[in-house]
Amino acid sequence: MPTKLYWAEGPWRGRLAMASRPRGDDWLEDEMASWRREGIDTVFSLLTSEEAKDLGLEDEAKHVKARGMQFVSFPIPDRDVPDSDAKVAMALERLDADLSAGRNVVIHCRQGVGRSGLISAALLVMKGFTPEAAIKSLSASRGASVPETAGQRRWLDHYAAILGGTKLAPSHTVR
């Protein structure tokens, strides 16, 4: 059975999905074919290279591209948060541009709850949602509470404060 996509509501022409990692190794080609049939245009992976290797997903980018989709890797360690506000801003702008252009995007991590929920919530906050509203909407879509950790929730509040113009030191990292 293919990895389930959890579709989220958002203000874009394209659609946003969260998912756990696709099945790897011999199943990877079938997984990417399934995601393409579901209408996915961009696969946004939050797995680290070590996780991808352990899960049989070293060739994920190759299989994604072979199906005519775009692949973006933005590694965040499991149960953690982005390590750079500038890098996450660029990643979120890329996701927002794809979604605004009508492209369908899936964001995945290992279980599709913590990191996927965090980045999806940050996208909604970027579009004007409060952190609470983003979490409520995405948790309902996912059928599980997102994001996974208190540190991820603190980071989402930190990101919302940055967008709201709150002055923070550029090197400030919330964990």
PLM features: what roles do these ranges have?
Residues 112:
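Conserved G/P- and acidic residue-centered "switch" motifs that form tight phosphate/ATP-binding loops
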Residues 109:
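Short cysteine clusters
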Residues 116:
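Ser/Thr-glycine-rich phosphate-binding loops at phosphate-binding pockets of nucleotides
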Residues 1-106, 119-175:
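Cys-dependent protein tyrosine phosphatase-like superfamily
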